[in-house]
Amino acid sequence: MSDTLLNPYFGEFGGMYVPEILVPVLKQLEQAFVEAQNDPTFQAEFADLLKNYAGRPTALTLCRNLTKGTKTKLYLKREDLLHGGAHKTNQVLGQILLAKRMGKTRIIAETGAGQHGVATALACAMLDMPCRVYMGAKDVERQSPNVFRMRLMGAEVIPVQKGSCSLKDACCEAMRDWSANYETTHYLLGTAAGPHPFPTIVREFQKMIGEETKRQILEREGRLPDAVIAAVGGGSNAIGMFADFIDESNVRLIGVEPAGKGIETGEHGAPLKHGTTGIYFGMKSPIMQDKDGQIEESYSISAGLDFPSVGPQHAYLNEIGRAEYVSITDEEALNAFQELAKHEGIIPALESSHALAYALKLIKQNPEKEQLLVVNLSGRGDKDIFTVDKILTEKGMK
């Protein structure tokens, strides 16, 4: 792999572990990406779509009520306000422009919560590209509003009935399709994971989240935050937030994995802290696997965090100690979901609720501490209201 244009590794993590047939395809993608990054016309078109179609820059909102009685200032980076309802739209626009540049005529994608699927469907509709989205059958059931949105915008949604019927199985099916149709098809991967160059492409097409946050917080507070906090599944919203702060050594980078029903139960999605390094989904990264190397089922109340591995740059940031990775249970995320809705009038995605829950935990631990925190509110919670309603009804909490 010494003949790649960009470094395919982050420390020991990353790489390009794919069938031989896909290696030239990935190298073609890398070449097109490097050229596009240096092409002012491509950059201008991408910037125009982000501004006039997606609605960037997104707001940085101060929480007025959640921190009452404490000395914390808590800001939310409002990716939930982006067209499509989540941060996913950013990099989808970039990748489809890249696919068109490469002469591809068809887009495929995988989706968990459905947010990446919706972003892919809306961008394909606008940029006139046929689109197929693979989605675990379990996720099709629990994210029905997003399935309807995708189909409404012309996408073909394929429920995947294999394995755990969740995101990892959708990823495998998308890979199979791509292997068979790579000449005409671009696989629009939804997170900062997978084989090189996807982790780098996705980070570069998401890093405006952190760049905008830095500008906005300096404008509002005259200083950088003490910590930026983001949920981590595959890791795209978090790396988008972290990228511009990595060199700011005084800013803590905190990634929040799903602890599900509790780490001790084994029903979680926290491979960074509770997995082991292995090869999965075309990359070397921490994964949830048994002693024989078989991939274990991940679990989270949040479909978008229900993934047994994590992007290689997060693995590297964890290893070198630049970022901290913690975990939050379903119950803690549910509480944060309700708190934000009740006190700030914002309904967050269950994914983002994990990051918010950790911020609230930090504040509660030391209410007298003067601190400036930013949570990446990666998506809105419309898609989750039926899931939450059902859980609260079952618990008799309504």
Swiss-Prot record:
Catalytic activity reported: (1S,2R)-1-C-(indol-3-yl)glycerol 3-phosphate + L-serine = D-glyceraldehyde 3-phosphate + L-tryptophan + H2O
Domain of life: Bacteria
Residues annotated with N6-(pyridoxal phosphate)lysine modification: 88
Pfam family, one: PALP
EC number: 4.2.1.20
GO terms for cellular component: cytoplasm
Cofactor: pyridoxal 5'-phosphate
CDD domains associated with the record: Trp-synth_B
Alphabetic keyword roster: Amino-acid biosynthesis, Aromatic amino acid biosynthesis, Lyase, Pyridoxal phosphate, Tryptophan biosynthesis
Pathway: Amino-acid biosynthesis; L-tryptophan biosynthesis; L-tryptophan from chorismate: step 5/5
Classification via SUPFAM superfamilies: Tryptophan synthase beta subunit-like PLP-dependent enzymes (SSF53686)
GO MF entries: tryptophan synthase activity
HAMAP family: Trp_synth_beta
Family: Belongs to the TrpB family.
Entry function: The beta subunit is responsible for the synthesis of L-tryptophan from indole and L-serine.
Subunit architecture: Tetramer of two alpha and two beta chains.
Name of the protein: Tryptophan synthase beta chain
Source organism: Haemophilus influenzae (strain PittGG)
Classification lineage: Bacteria, Pseudomonadati, Pseudomonadota, Gammaproteobacteria, Pasteurellales
Gene this chain is encoded by: trpB
